[in-house]
């Protein structure tokens, strides 16, 4: 499509499509900057791009929130231009043969909880938490998680009066059935607790490779959602989280114990996973599963895996977003993903480093993307009335919050800017002041087991790991 929108954004190749429109790669003809352009027919039956653009505007400034560059109407289309981002969690999950190890999941969980918390603090529920809606950044932001796709987001309280939306029943299912909370299946109005329960399912999906209610067959979409709901309700969290650390069970017991209007204890949830991360002896080095696949030399110097992989595939570059995801895992999913993205992988590599294993700093404005149209087979259902009754919202006993006591200070809910400057290597090879003082390892170089102790010999590995987590939330809330 040879078209310019917003006076300066030329549309390139199509990145994806979905029920709400199409996503294109775009280029700012004045600066050469690559962007993501989302188009929606202006005469769409249920237009939502204008609403979504307003959400982007209201959320601007938060860490992991794409920058809205322009919104308007061009001919027969509503158009929204935002930052171009890297691959989604679903893409990376496929790239890693549909399984993440514990270390990768814990590093992602901390950032993902922060993203959900930020939206809640700004007065909105996301209501479609799933792997497709969390993307990695590009260039200097390659280790930063972004949250996208606010088309189903809903305001749950007034920021002036702080009045919460009322409790309601008989609501239609909004979101993706695979990750929807039990109460959402039962037709109960969603609140903050539901976003967090959905996030818990995403984390278990990463660890397990699939969820117990995937692949259920039914004659109609409604029957399928009912089967998913039943299986989800009949699967105890202890069974869902079996063979994994008890912190994941504690997470579910806590979020399911929340009442409709309760404010979640986000620091407690993050502390659960931070303490587990430290107890496992992991290094906070930003070496994810896909980092090892891309640069195998990282594997020998990093504690990235809780269990060694039987074999490492050839180093390849992570995929960029795609439009459709498989509903069921397959044995060759990882290789299929690599083959499918062969051309696009090279583009990602050019932004995030060469095959030498050293990621070069991107001195231009960080490019970011939105895979707003990615979806699984469990798509947002059509309207239908729910007949199930709500489950009890009685809070669980306090035993559900038996977390390992930690010295981590409770992170302020207003601290949302992650300091990434300490993890960038300038092209001249010199470390910045932030790099010399913040004790965060550079993810673009091979991790060293003694790198922390040289910088601060009097501090324990636990203290330094905790500081690495805290740096994720230290800041003034301004976009960097």
Curated annotation (Swiss-Prot):
Kindly list the GO molecular function terms attached to this UniProt entry: ATP binding; protein serine kinase activity; protein serine/threonine kinase activity
- Tell me what reaction this enzyme catalyses: L-seryl-[protein] + ATP = O-phospho-L-seryl-[protein] + ADP + H(+); L-threonyl-[protein] + ATP = O-phospho-L-threonyl-[protein] + ADP + H(+)
The UniProt annotation puts the region (Disordered) at 298-461
Compositionally skewed regions (Low complexity) per UniProt = 299-311, 395-414, 443-459
What Enzyme Commission number does this protein have?
2.7.11.1
Q: What are the record keywords, sorted?
A: ATP-binding, Cell junction, Cytoplasm, Kinase, Nucleotide-binding, Serine/threonine-protein kinase, Transferase
Q: Which residues catalyse the reaction?
A: 128
Where found, per UniProt?
Answer: Cytoplasm; Cell junction, Plasmodesma
Write down the InterPro entries for this protein, in alphabetical order. CK1_Ser-Thr_kinase, Kinase-like_dom_sf, Prot_kinase_dom, Protein_kinase_ATP_BS, Ser/Thr_kinase_AS
Which residue stretches does the UniProt record annotate as biased composition, category Polar residues? 369-383, 422-438
Summarize the PTM comment.
Answer: Autophosphorylated.
Pfam families, per the entry? Pkinase
Chief place of localization: cytoplasm
CDD domains (alphabetical): STKc_CK1_delta_epsilon (cd14125)
Residues of the Protein kinase domain: 9-278
Question: Quick one: which residues bind ATP?
Answer: 15-23, 38
A single Gene Ontology CC annotation of this entry is:
plasmodesma
Q: Which family does it belong to?
A: Belongs to the protein kinase superfamily. CK1 Ser/Thr protein kinase family. Casein kinase I subfamily.
User: Its function?
Assistant: Casein kinases are operationally defined by their preferential utilization of acidic proteins such as caseins as substrates. It can phosphorylate a large number of proteins.
**What is the protein's quaternary organization?**
Monomer.
| Protein's name in the database | Casein kinase 1-like protein 8
Q: Whose protein is this, by species?
A: Arabidopsis thaliana (Mouse-ear cress)
User: Which lineage do the record's taxonomy fields give for this organism?
Assistant: Eukaryota, Viridiplantae, Streptophyta, Embryophyta, Tracheophyta
Q: Which gene encodes it?
A: CKL8
């Amino acid at each position: 499509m040879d078209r310019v929108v917003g006076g300066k954004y030329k549309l390139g190749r199509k990145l994806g499509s979905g029920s709400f429109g199409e996503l294109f790669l775009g280029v700012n003809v004045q600066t050469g900057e690559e962007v993501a352009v989302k188009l929606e027919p202006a005469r769409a039956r249920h237009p939502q791009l204008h609403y979504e653009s307003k959400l982007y505007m209201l959320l601007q400034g938060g860490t992991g929130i794409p920058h809205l560059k322009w919104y308007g109407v061009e001919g027969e289309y509503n158009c929204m231009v935002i930052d171009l981002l890297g691959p989604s969690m679903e893409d990376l999950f496929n790239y890693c043969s549909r399984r993440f190890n514990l270390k990768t999941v814990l590093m992602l969980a901390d950032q993902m909880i922060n993203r959900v918390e930020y939206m809640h603090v700004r007065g909105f529920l996301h209501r479609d938490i799933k792997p497709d809606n969390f993307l990695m950044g590009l260039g200097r932001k390659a280790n930063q998680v972004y949250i996208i796709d606010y088309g189903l987001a809903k305001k749950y309280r007034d920021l002036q009066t702080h009045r919460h939306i009322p409790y309601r029943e008989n609501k239609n299912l909004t979101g993706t059935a695979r990750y929807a909370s039990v109460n959402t299946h039962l037709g109960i109005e969603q609140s903050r607790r539901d976003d967090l329960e959905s996030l818990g399912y995403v984390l278990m999906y990463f660890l397990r490779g699939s969820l117990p209610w995937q692949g259920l067959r039914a004659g109609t979409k409604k029957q399928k959602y009912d089967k998913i709901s039943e299986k989800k309700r009949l699967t105890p969290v202890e069974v869902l989280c079996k063979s994994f650390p008890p912190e994941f069970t504690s997470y579910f017991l806590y979020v399911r114990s929340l009442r409709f209007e309760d404010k979640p204890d986000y620091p407690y949830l993050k502390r659960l996973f931070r303490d587990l991360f430290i107890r496992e002896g992991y290094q906070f080095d930003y070496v994810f599963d896909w980092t090892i696949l891309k640069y195998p030399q990282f594997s020998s110097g990093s504690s990235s895996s809780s269990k060694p992989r039987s074999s490492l595939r050839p180093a390849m570059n992570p995929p960029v977003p795609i439009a459709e995801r498989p509903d069921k895992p397959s044995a060759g999913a990882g290789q299929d993903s690599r083959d499918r993205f062969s051309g696009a992988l090279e583009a990602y590599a050019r932004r995030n480093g060469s095959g030498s294993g050293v990621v070069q700093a991107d001195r231009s404005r960080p490019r970011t993307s939105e895979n707003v149209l990615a979806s699984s087979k469990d798509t947002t259902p059509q309207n239908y009335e729910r007949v199930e009754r709500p489950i009890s919202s009685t809070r669980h006993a306090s035993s559900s919050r038996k977390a390992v006591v930690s010295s981590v200070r409770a992170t302020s809910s207003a601290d949302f800017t992650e300091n990434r400057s300490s993890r960038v290597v300038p092209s001249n090879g010199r470390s910045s002041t932030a790099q010399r003082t913040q004790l965060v390892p550079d993810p673009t170089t091979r991790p060293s087991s003694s790198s922390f102790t040289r910088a601060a010999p009097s501090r324990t590995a636990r203290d330094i790991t905790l500081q690495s987590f805290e740096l994720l939330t230290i800041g003034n809330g301004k976009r960097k």
